[in-house]
Amino acid sequence: VLKNNKGSEDNRVRKLDYSIQISKLFYERFINEEDITLFSPHEVPDLYEAWGTEAFDELYLKAERKISVKKKKISAQELFFDILKERAETGRIYIMNIDHCNTHSSFKDLIRMSNLCQEITLPTDPIQHIDGEGEIALCILSAINVGKIDKRDELEELCDLAVRSCLLYTSDAADEVVS
């Protein structure tokens, strides 16, 4: 609905592409025709932080059992087929197998994200400010992890940082080519 012609203009997002990371646990439940449980990252921040690590499965199962955590159960097959249908209709959803990236990476550090097309899988460290320490491993399309945004004001700041970083990168790259 976000990218295709279904729904109304109010619930479509035409200028945004989607990258979905899927875990080994999801695939296991898909194959076994089981349900998957969906959580808000704000409900289970420890689970969100453990994404892509060995601790994720244990924390996930614990959150599923916890009565006080808001959650929604859905068929893993239904969800995956919906994702594949949207991908087939729009060509704009990219799927990353996060556990596979980490088990087959030549890096000791975790792969937490990728560029949109999923071909750049390098370790990254968060950047809080354009002059701060951190590590970016993306093409110049850039990316913002909206799951980490708590307040609307943060989005504007992150967008500014992303644009500045892209401009700085392309400017530095142009200087190197000219030199």
Regions found by a protein language model. Name each.
Residues 31, 146, 176:
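Residue-level marker of positions within ordered structural domains that often coincide
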Residues 1-109:
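Conserved, charged catalytic cores of large soluble enzymes
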Residues 10-17, 70-74, 84, 129-132, ...:
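Alpha-helix capping and helix-loop boundary segments enriched in small/acidic/polar residues
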Residues 172-178:
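Single conserved hydrophobic/aromatic residue that forms the stacking wall/gate
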Residues 93, 100-167:
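Internal glycine-rich alpha/beta core junctions
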